[in-house]
Amino acid sequence: MSDDVVVQPEPADHANQSVPTYSWYALSVLVLVYTLNFIDRQILSILANDIKQDLGVDDAYLGFLYGTAFAIFYALFGIPLGKLADSWKRVRLMTLGLSLWSAMTAFSGFARDAGTLTVARIGVGVGEATASPSAYSLISDWFPARIRATALAIYSSGIYIGGGISLAIGGVIVDNWNQAFP
């Protein structure tokens, strides 16, 4: 006798069940949220020269802003927020996170000094830390094992969609900003 766990395959009738339309709709909303998440993360790299000029900061500060100010707080809060996603309402948690990072992104636009921009980017990191733990858990609930990897891959496409869109949006912002404030 062994203590190995035997995994039973899904019954044939369960394996052939279609995924509810709501699951696909919800996945598309999650992809949109993840896309916005990465637009927000990447757009600062396009705006770097203008931020340096407007706030009088150097490359070291921008490195701190992109790395430490955002990433440390994203990582620090990701673990407890992931645990909270396991025990609380995941959609509500993601909504609160999206609200926080959206507010902090808007607050970034009003920053008149490096300290204010740093606080805003920390807030963005904390808010964005709610997204993936909540999304992975929700996707696991909404999609059966036979299609879950596909659903997760679709969700992950938001990284690349957001990264690409951020370049276009950032370029438009820089052009318009420089025309308005030569």
Feature map (PLM): residue ranges:
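Cytosolic juxtamembrane N-terminal segment immediately preceding the first transmembrane helix
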Residues: 2-39
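Residue-level signature of mid-helix packing/kink "hotspots" within the transmembrane helices
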Residues: 42, 70-79, 129, 163-164
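Extracellular/periplasmic helix-loop-helix junction of adjacent transmembrane segments
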Residues: 47-76
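Membrane-interface helix termini in secondary transporters
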Residues: 50, 79-83, 172
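Helix-breaking motifs and short loop linkers at transmembrane-helix boundaries and internal kinks
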Residues: 56, 89, 110-116, 127, ...
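Conserved MFS/SLC helix-loop-helix module at the cytosolic interface between two early adjacent transmembrane helices
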Residues: 76-115
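Cytoplasmic helix-loop-helix junction between adjacent transmembrane helices
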Residues: 120-158
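Helix-loop-helix hairpin linking two adjacent transmembrane segments in secondary transporters
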Residues: 155, 159-182
